[in-house]
Amino acid sequence: MRNTMNLTNLLAPWLDCPELADITVQSLELDSRQVKQGDTFVAIVGHVVDGRQYIEKAIEQGANAVIAQSCQQYPSGLVRYQQNVVIVYLEKLDEKLSQLAGRLYQHPEMSLIGVTGTNGKTTITQLIAQWLELAGQKAAVMGTTGNGFLNALQPAANTTGNAVEIQKTLADLQQQGAKATALEVSSHGLVQGRVKALQFAAGVFTNLSRDHLDYHGTMEAYAKAKMTLFTEHQCQHAIINLDDEVGAQWFQELQQGVGVSLFPQDASVKALWASSVAYAESGITIEFDGCFGQGRLHAPLIGEFNATNLLLALATLLALGVDKQALLDSAASLRPVLGRMELFQVNSKAKVVVDYAHTPDALEKALQALRVHCTGHLWAIFGCGGDRDKGKRPMMAEIAERLADHVVLTDDNPRSEDPTMIVQDMLAGLTRADSAVVEHDRFSALQYALDNAQADDIILLAGKGHEDYQVLKHQTVHYSDRESAQQLLGISS
């Protein structure tokens, strides 16, 4: 049963409006196009759009009331009517949105785990949810690959949805029996206060490397945004990757910190660390030690960074009191995440690994991880997104040339930019222009690699991962790296 509240009570922490008590709020909506009869429209000044421009449209759609961000003309506390629909103004509404939505949808009584960092968020949230399910606790995720239970994810437009969507989704998940939800928390989401009112049982920091500089401007601003999960949000435990330079620095400053490392730490440090790690085609075997005692686990995942991801997920669940033996016994049943170092293979052809790596750091880690498993030549196929940080294009090409034996440059959501110009930016990072082949069509790029690779080669198809679209200048078309790999290898999906 969906919660309802009268408008007076909803606004009570900020405004005294007894005259609004007869207006029932049953659902909040930020997008005027999505307003249905009886919804309450919330008009905030967003990063790109000013929602107040769409008040009239929302009323025409059937909004029963409007809560709008105040301005000089309409100060906070003002109540006015338009076409017999009440509009009430509230200052800094964009900052209050998470709390406002939380009051209506009731802060869900479940364990919330927030995961932030440049890379690894999706894998860690899904490992946490998988592991909890294996331990007998119903768990959900919210993030890049969708929201909900792992066997029934609903598509998500952004890594971290808007503040209203988050509260609404959490209330729905709780109603469906979720005892815990692991959320990917993006830097955009933190800066814009989308998770401001959530109480996190644990926060996890994965790593920090170049990304989203088109939004944040500098690495310092980007790091500061990530740090707020632990300093400005309610976060009981902070699980920090000590092998990341920024993480090691933050760990010194956070009282609630639990460190995680692939290298032995001093016994006085509150941390979980690997005493030995073994990589094989069947997966990763880790022996660990530290503040949660000793243990050994095996999981069918590939690569050094997945050893870190496993330990971060393990430390989080141990900090939350999940039984250690239950976690170690079930680790072998964990599964790779869709489009994250996902292996496609058949006899007598090169292996294809599909991964979401679309930053310099992620590409470097993916290639280094595969080199350990590769007995033949290593191939890298990737592109760079249009209308995004141009500085990373030559960096990614330099990494591919250095770490792979063969490089194929292709398109990856060129958006409004000319794909040939994006490739030119990438080529600038190469020491030799002839060390890369250019094939703009991703399917053809993979076909070229498979035609020229030997059976013991590994082909990394990087950048899109779980995505099933390609964003062009005037349209978005269906395209999937996973489907391309299955089709070209003759694997039935």
UniProtKB/Swiss-Prot annotation:
Entry's EC annotation: 6.3.2.13
Binding locations of ATP: 117-123
Catalytic activity, reaction form: UDP-N-acetyl-alpha-D-muramoyl-L-alanyl-D-glutamate + meso-2,6-diaminopimelate + ATP = UDP-N-acetyl-alpha-D-muramoyl-L-alanyl-gamma-D-glutamyl-meso-2,6-diaminopimelate + ADP + phosphate + H(+)
Cofactors required: Mg(2+)
Binding site for UDP-N-acetyl-alpha-D-muramoyl-L-alanyl-D-glutamate: 30, 32, 158-160, 186, 192, 194
Binding positions (meso-2,6-diaminopimelate): 388, 412-415, 463, 467
GO cellular component, one term: cytoplasm
PTM comment: Carboxylation is probably crucial for Mg(2+) binding and, consequently, for the gamma-phosphate positioning of ATP.
Gene3D superfamilies: Mur ligase, C-terminal domain, Mur-like, catalytic domain, MurE/MurF, N-terminal domain
Cell compartment(s), UniProt: Cytoplasm
This protein's pathway: Cell wall biogenesis; peptidoglycan biosynthesis
GO BP term, example: cell division
GO molecular function, one term: UDP-N-acetylmuramoylalanyl-D-glutamate-2,6-diaminopimelate ligase activity
Primary subcellular site in the record, as a coarse category: cytoplasm
Family membership noted in the UniProt record: Belongs to the MurCDEF family. MurE subfamily.
Function according to Swiss-Prot or TrEMBL: Catalyzes the addition of meso-diaminopimelic acid to the nucleotide precursor UDP-N-acetylmuramoyl-L-alanyl-D-glutamate (UMAG) in the biosynthesis of bacterial cell-wall peptidoglycan.
Name of the molecule in the record: UDP-N-acetylmuramoyl-L-alanyl-D-glutamate--2,6-diaminopimelate ligase
Source species taxonomy: Bacteria, Pseudomonadati, Pseudomonadota, Gammaproteobacteria, Vibrionales
Gene (name only): murE
